[in-house]
Regions:
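Basic/polar N-terminal segments that are highly enriched at the extreme N-terminus
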Residues: 1-9
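Short, contiguous alpha-helical
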Residues: 8-23, 29-72, 112-156
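Solvent-exposed, charged/polar functional surfaces in cytosolic regulatory/catalytic domains
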Residues: 17-20, 24, 88, 92-99, ...
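Secondary-structure boundary/capping positions in well-ordered alpha/beta enzyme cores
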Residues: 28-29, 103
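Helix-adjacent hinge/juxtasegments
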Residues: 57-58, 62-101
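Acidic catalytic patch
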Residues: 99-115
Length: 156
């Protein structure tokens, strides 16, 4: 069995759980933040929706320099818009995940910012830590934001 065959079911569950969470994000609470140093909901929710695109970068490139990346955060409009962004990114990432050969998981992957190393390790570790664990972390934050705004928190 290929490594990607082991990872695809987990990817599918995490994307489903993320979709369920994003579906409940209230459009009228974009400015809400539980603490002055916390991201407002209108920035956190789009960040979560766009994270699969980061997974795609990890799976298909040897490195990313944030200073050279042409990243534009999506504006927060609605839960439906966030779900659409998530699903588009997840579909591309799933396709790349299904296609990646086993030996590519051991390839080195780097994340830098203006020449300064942020991450330097295996593609597998980058995928796991910087994409999958990252989306779970921020999805949990969204759950707290939902609870604090009397929204239903999905049972995931």
């Amino acid at each position: 069995m290929r490594i990607s065959d082991l990872l695809l079911p987990e990817f599918d569950v995490e994307m489903k759980n993320t979709r369920t969470t994003l579906e409940r994000v209230p459009a009228d609470k974009a400015e809400f933040a539980p603490h002055p140093r916390s991201m407002p909901l209108g920035r956190l929710a789009p960040h979560v929706a766009q994270l699969p695109a980061f997974g795609l970068i990890i799976l298909t490139t040897p490195e990313l320099d944030f200073a050279k990346a042409n990243f534009k955060p999506v504006p927060f409009e609605s839960a439906a818009q966030l779900v659409k962004v998530l699903e588009e990114g997840a579909a591309q990432t799933r396709k790349a995940l299904a296609a990646i050969p086993d030996d590519a998981w051991n390839d080195n992957w780097k994340l830098t910012m203006q020449g300064k190393s942020i991450f330097d390790g295996s593609r597998f570790l980058a995928y796991r830590q910087m994409f999958l664990n990252h989306i779970v972390h921020h999805r949990a934050q969204l759950g707290v934001y939902l609870r604090m705004n009397e929204e239903k928190v999905p049972a995931i």
